[in-house]
Amino acid sequence: MKKKNPKNKDLIGKQKYTVSDSNSEWVLYHNNFSLCSRKVRICLEEYKIDYLPVHIHIIETKDCENLSKDFLKINPKATVPVLLHNNQPIYESHEQIRYLMETFPNKLGESETVDYWNTKGSLVGDDPVSGIKDYAGNCVSLLTQPLFVSMLRKISFFKFFNYFIKHPSKFRALNFTLYRLLGYSVFNKNSPHQRVAIKAFENLKSHMTSLDGHLENKIWIDGDKFSIADITWMTLLHRLDEVNLVEIFTEKLNNLRDYYFRLKNRESFSSCIIEFSSETIYSGTKNLREDIQKVSNLRQLYNSFESNPLP
């Protein structure tokens, strides 16, 4: 099968061409910090699939390897993860997971309940703000902004210039450039970023309360069977942990607290999230925790989260 340079319009699902000469049946181009990469890594672990991991730095984790010529040959959209099966690329994480589920049926729980909660925990649409009432994933994406600021502040302006010029999504590139230039001041009182974060948190409270109620007398979202929905919420809850928000929910929602405890004790949590951590992620989360106490507008933002009771 001949190699072919993919076109942007083709980049959904499995393609018929190859983009690599790897001897490995499965290859995953991923990033340690990316939520979508974490989801696919966990799926591969739960399916017990041997794969070759190829780490690609994105600007949050100190570099722009996703904008390199070599990676753009793999994915012109410059996004991770990309899963290769026999060197044929599968684009978009939800399509990669669907492909795994179709290739290895009945290994993870499947039901209407799984579909509902998996979608509820996903980032849906091109504009996260428009979906915050329906999708917890959209809320968590917007609440990750303070962590982005913490992780990006040591990235050189030269790299940011390169990032802005080359990144195919100018909206994302502009937002991240603002994080680097303005720092936590993007969360000043009544600023657009502050208002969006507060709205996202208000809607996330409703999603978390609903999940807590659903988990009554259940081990996993679909009862006794671990599923893709649990993988989705594993990554979301851990991201809330990274942004110093998860305890607001687990201190008051007992079912959610016990559920997160079970998720953290699963082998795939340790092997696919914790063991794939890095100094950049560690220092970013550590600095954010410290900055919440030291930076007045950031402290005010987090105080507003904590002062609003759960529904």
Residue ranges with predicted function:
Residues M1-A173, R299-P311:
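GST-like domain detector, emphasizing the conserved glutathione-binding G-site
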Residues M1-F33, R38-I49, I58-L67, A197-P311:
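C-terminal or late-domain output modules
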Residues P105-D115, F161-K170, Y184, N188, ...:
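A short, terminal or domain-edge coil/loop segment
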Residues G125-F261:
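GST-like fold's C-terminal all-alpha helical module
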